[in-house]
Amino acid sequence: MSSIFINKGVEMMESEKSGGMDRYVTFERIDCFKNAHEVVSNALRVLEANPEMKNPFWEKFCSKIPDSFYSYTPQEDLLYLVCANVFYLEELFDEAEDEEGQAIMSRCEFECC
């Protein structure tokens, strides 16, 4: 076995011991629903502020936002929607030059997708 894999395992265990979050060890302290909710909230904000960015894709995306988003009831379907559309969401935030959306999308993708 390569020392690279062993070193990564040691790093992951040390991260866990120090209280750091590492999705490869556990999702225990990562609120993926909150992350996904923030991504969708920011996407809706960007689309509202930039009506010229709306197109049939975003209309369809908005129609697929589950009820759990609006009721803030943690369910996996919201995370699935975000993770299945990472590329498009990143592009939306990039085109809008929305740093907050970019940061939240990056965090959600890294921690949860």
From Swiss-Prot:
Which stretches are transmembrane?
Answer: none
Which Gene Ontology BP annotations are present? nitrogen fixation
By its UniProt entry, which Pfam families does this protein fall under?
Answer: CowN
The highest taxon in the source lineage is: Bacteria
Key word Cell division present: no
* Keyword Lipoprotein applies: no
What keywords are assigned to this protein? Nitrogen fixation
Entry-linked InterPro entries = CowN (IPR024899)
Q: Which family does it belong to?
A: Belongs to the CowN family.
The free-text function statement in the UniProt record for this protein reads:
Is required to sustain N(2)-dependent growth in the presence of low levels of carbon monoxide (CO). Probably acts by protecting the N(2) fixation ability of the nitrogenase complex, which is inactivated in the presence of CO.
Its name, as the record gives it, is: N(2)-fixation sustaining protein CowN
Organismal lineage: Bacteria, Pseudomonadati, Campylobacterota, Epsilonproteobacteria, Campylobacterales
